[in-house]
Amino acid sequence: MAFYPLQIAGLVLGFLGMVGTLATTLLPQWRVSAFVGSNIIVFERLWEGLWMNCIRQARVRLQCKFYSSLLALPPALETARALMCVAVALSLIALLIGICGMKQVQCTGSNERAKAYLLGTSGVLFILTGIFVLIPVSWTANIIIRDFYNPAIHIGQKRELGAALFLGWASAAVLFIGGGLLCGFCCCNRKKQGYRYPVPGYRVPHTDKRRNTTMLSKTSTSYV
């Protein structure tokens, strides 16, 4: 199968994007304490994630607590949870489909066309996963920036962009690149197969027995 390094690079990037998506979903550093104004000197750091919030005080170990009530969560947080969970599931499905489409795996036998379609499907799912990651990450970042510059919000309630958001953006970019490589591999493989013309087979010349018999009879009659 041609363009083999292309599919390997696409699957590796897809795997890295899946790991980054899972880490982004689980990490609590989506919203972190903002050290501005009179809040520059503080003795504690506050992290807020999709599933828990963590507080780290001076000379005290990190303390994390899961959100106790699902109904009390803001709609933006609930939507981000749902989208990130869907993204993790899609990335796992895309990776499994991509593995089935590899040259060494005999799930579809030696059918190169079927393998190319599997890799193309995997690439589309990776791109879709990147979109699902990009939406909640960018939405949360927009809310943080909007509240940060809102003078009506107290300084102690303002937050900054956490490391999980940057990891989410990086994961989405990796997923887009990996999915694009797999889709490109599928297109290149289809073009390659489109240039293959069937080789004409050798046909055994057909002889007409009746014609040969008639010719022989005429020849024998002429000699008589």
Curated annotation (Swiss-Prot):
Tissue-specificity statement: In the kidney, expressed in the proximal tubule and in the Henle's loop. In the distal convoluted tubule, not expressed in all tubules. Not detected in the collecting duct (at protein level).
Superkingdom of origin organism: Eukaryota
Consequence recorded when altering H154A: Loss of anion selectivity. Strongly increased permeabilities not only for chloride, but also for sodium and the larger anions, including pyruvate, nitrate and thiocyanate. No effect on localization to cell-cell junctions
Membrane-spanning parts: 8-28, 82-102, 125-145, 165-185
PROSITE patterns assigned: CLAUDIN
Membrane association type: Multi-pass membrane protein
Membrane side Cytoplasmic: residue ranges: 1-7, 103-124, 186-224
Protein name listed in UniProt: Claudin-17
